[in-house]
Structure formats: structure tokens, C-alpha cells
Amino acid sequence: MRGDISKKTCEYILVLMMVCILLLTGCSESNDTDEDGMIKAEESSGISSVSLVIGSDNYEPYNYIDESGENVGIDVDIAKEACRRMGITPVFKQITWDRKDSFLDSNEIDCLWGSFTMSGRTDDYRWAGPYMYSRQVVIARKDREINSFADLKGKRIAVQSTSKPEHIILSGEDDRIQGVSAVYSMSTMSELYASLRKGYIDAAAGHEVAIKRFVDTNPQQFIILDETLYKSELGVAFKKGRCDDIPDILNDILKQMIDDGTIKKIAESYGINADIFMGDN
């Protein structure tokens, strides 16, 4: 299966875009969609055979592999429904996140879809979204007497490589976090969590939803600091210049899923406070 999207595929999806425009301009009376909002396959000239290769790493609860070996998570469920409505097949590929751009450049994947922060990266990719929001927060070991960002002075903190927290902390742009003794950039969140458990580091930073799930399994050992490191918009990233109509179509589908409550319902199914998750608070 190819990671790139062919010219023929783009032509197929252009047909879909035309149908979407009709729907958005009030022309849905022509019965172009079914009752679930799915674009009819007969209008797409076989579009259902087209796949979208989605790259992400293991980042629970957004994207992860369950005990049966299946791809699951908030982003996975959103992607499955969005692709269903577009009439295409999602193919999930686990990647090394700090090599994400090389996967895009080599056409091994079509897009990055894994709690990926748009903020500060709007010119780097072709985006669909935002489709939800996130807070970047700091988790600390309770035995290290860290109760605020100021207490991170002289402490060891870990971040995921190429993440927004890595940039913020290494650049020193946040005046609230100064004088940390060391910053460790790790390839995966699993490595980060293991280092926290073993006490190799004092604190770490990441998406609140993922961090909270980890803390809930270890409430006696860890705390989440009250301060917010960064508020971000999450989106789906495509390489610029490659079938740019697809992000536009996906963007419209994601808006529909926000408006009809689908994304909120998916978030709630993972025990998430959906009002905050959707940016309502």
C-alpha cells in the first residue's frame, strides 16, 4: 500500500469536495448524503477504495495499541469517523515522533494525526483543524517538593522530543520556568513515564489529557501543577504541496463533526471533560 496519494485519488477527492460544497450551501436536498452524513459512494466514482495513511506515535488516550493489537484512542476514533464520512479508508501507522517530518517527506504517510499542536506551526504544514484543544501541563513527583513552576529551579525535567514543551523549556521563553538543572528530550511518552517512576527525573511536561491518565494510575506518587504551560489547538498536518484539496475537505468534515456533537461524544467516551476539551471553557 502506498503512503502517497496519487493524482487519480486527488481527482476522486475533488469530486467529493464539490459534493461537500453543495451540502454546505444548502443543496443537500438532492440526497447526496445518507442520514449519518456520509458522502454516497456512487458520487465518488469508487473513492471508497482510497486510503489515507495516518502517522502517529503511542500517546494514550489519543492514539495507542490496545491488548488485542488494535489502534484505539480519541484521535483514532475521530479519524475513523471522518474518513467514513469522506468515503475513504484510514490506515494507521505507528511512527517515531521525532522523525515525523521524514515520514511525511518520504511519502510513507499522508498526514500526522496525533494530538499535534497547530499553534506556532501554522506555516510548517497544510492543516485541517483545529478540531479540539489541549493544555500542556507539568507533572511532578510528590517526593521532590515541586508545587509550582518556580520550584522547578535546579530540577531535572523531561519532555518528548520535538514537542511544544521541549521548545518552551529549552528556549527559556517562559519566565516562570528558569534555572532547571537538566532537560531530557525523550522519543516516546513511555520512556518519559518510566523515567518518572524510577526517579531519574523530577518532573515532565505534556498534554493534560495524557498526563492526567498517567497520574490517575499513580495518584500517590505524582501531582499535576496548577499552572498551565501552554494552551494549544490540535489539528491534522499534511505536507505542503501534496494534494492540498484533501485538508480542505477534511477540515469541512471535522467542522461538521464538531457541530453535530460527534467529537464531543468521542471525547466523553474516554472519560474526558468534553466542555474543556472542545474549548468551551
Where are the language model's segments positioned?
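Bilobed "Venus flytrap"/periplasmic-binding protein-like clamshell domains
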Residues: 53, 57-60, 71-84, 116, ...
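Extended ligand-binding regions for polar small-molecule ligands
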Residues: 28-30, 76-85, 146, 150-151, ...
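Acidic, polar ligand-binding/catalytic clefts
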Residues: 80, 84, 89-151, 223, ...
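Ligand-binding clefts/hinges and TM-proximal coupling segments of bilobed small-molecule sensing domains
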Residues: 29-41, 89, 164-186, 223-225, ...
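A ligand-binding cleft/hinge motif common to bilobed small-molecule-binding domains
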Residues: 102, 115-124, 168-171, 195-231
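Periplasmic-binding protein-like
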Residues: 56-58, 133-140, 208, 212-255, ...
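C-terminal motif of bacterial Sec signal peptides marking the signal peptidase cleavage site
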Residues: 23-26
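Extracytoplasmic small-molecule ligand-binding "clamshell" domains
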Residues: 34-115, 185, 269
